Amino acid sequence: MSIGCKLISGREVAESIIDQVKAHTVALSANGITPGLAVIIVGSDPASQVYVASKGRKAEECGFLSIKHELPHDVPERRLLELIDSLNADPSIHGILVQLPLPRHVDSGKVIQAISPQKDIDGFHFINVGKLGTGALETAFVPCTPAGCMILVERIHGKDLSGLSAVVVGRSNIVGKPMANLLLAANATVTIAHSRTANLEVLCRQADILIAAVGRPEMIRSDWIKPGATVIDVGINRIASRDDGGKTRLVGDVDFDGAVERAGAVTPVPGGVGPMTIAMLMANTLRAACHANDEPAPHFGSGGVLR
């Protein structure tokens, strides 16, 4: 690792956010308020089961009411929508999360839009997307992964990114597009690119802040990185291990070994963005509980970008 490269520990930052969430939850409980999180999982996909279990454990650790609804793979879409309607009407539930992906016979878009915007802690409802796109961050729920990435960026650069060039590689509705909007709100000059962008490496070399969220293992090579840049690697890819024996290992979308010799700051995979996603899910659930009960919502961004 270069002497000047800072390793951004998402685990440490996530732990500090969880500590804040716990403290605010204790304060709410003094007023008889317990944040409630309901997670819906359809089918028995092993990866989804692991994700849901980790979210449930973290919610309980934070002192939340944590409820899991497990539905069979062949559940009718109507039944899923009815469950969401009942959770929308349940005052003890402040956040609703539907674990994706859903089976093919279920319209994921319809399901996401059925969640009340006030309980849409994933930030996928059109109303929350629109608020983020127009800069109404005070009342928007921001998708958890870009929200976490933004806090990591703030830890390096502060809340005002004026004069800095940011390149987001990835155009998904879950990470790329909301990430670009958050960077714009912080006054960065933003370019959003993707795997089909011409001369992508040239764009990346101009970035003071480089966000990699394209889902291709080690696509961003070290010589694409501007010396001293901040690199946030959102990718989580499982590839064959360098050792024999058929083992696998996790890598990001960035060539990490090369990046640490060139970047000013970089997130590792694992241990970078991943822990931040769950931490921000807990933060959004807490904020939803505060809003539902006319309580002041806490700050989680270093400069109040996320409230």
From Swiss-Prot:
Keyword Hydrolase attached: yes
Enzyme Commission number: 1.5.1.5, 3.5.4.9
GO biological process, one term: L-histidine biosynthetic process
Binding annotation for NADP(+): G170, R171, S172, S195, I236
Entry-linked PROSITE patterns: THF_DHG_CYH_2
Pathway in which this enzyme or protein is active: One-carbon metabolism; tetrahydrofolate interconversion
Keyword annotations of the record: Amino-acid biosynthesis, Histidine biosynthesis, Hydrolase, Methionine biosynthesis, Multifunctional enzyme, NADP, One-carbon metabolism, Oxidoreductase, Plasmid, Purine biosynthesis
N-terminal signal peptide: none
CC per GO annotation: cytosol
Substrates-to-products reaction catalysed: (6R)-5,10-methylene-5,6,7,8-tetrahydrofolate + NADP(+) = (6R)-5,10-methenyltetrahydrofolate + NADPH; (6R)-5,10-methenyltetrahydrofolate + H2O = (6R)-10-formyltetrahydrofolate + H(+)
Pfam name, any one: THF_DHG_CYH
Protein's UniProt keywords contain ATP-binding: no
One function term, GO molecular function aspect: methylenetetrahydrofolate dehydrogenase (NADP+) activity
CDD domains: NAD_bind_m-THF_DH_Cyclohyd
Job description of the protein: Catalyzes the oxidation of 5,10-methylenetetrahydrofolate to 5,10-methenyltetrahydrofolate and then the hydrolysis of 5,10-methenyltetrahydrofolate to 10-formyltetrahydrofolate.
Subunit description: Homodimer.
Protein family according to the UniProt entry: Belongs to the tetrahydrofolate dehydrogenase/cyclohydrolase family.
Protein name: Bifunctional protein FolD
Origin organism lineage: Bacteria, Pseudomonadati, Pseudomonadota, Alphaproteobacteria, Hyphomicrobiales
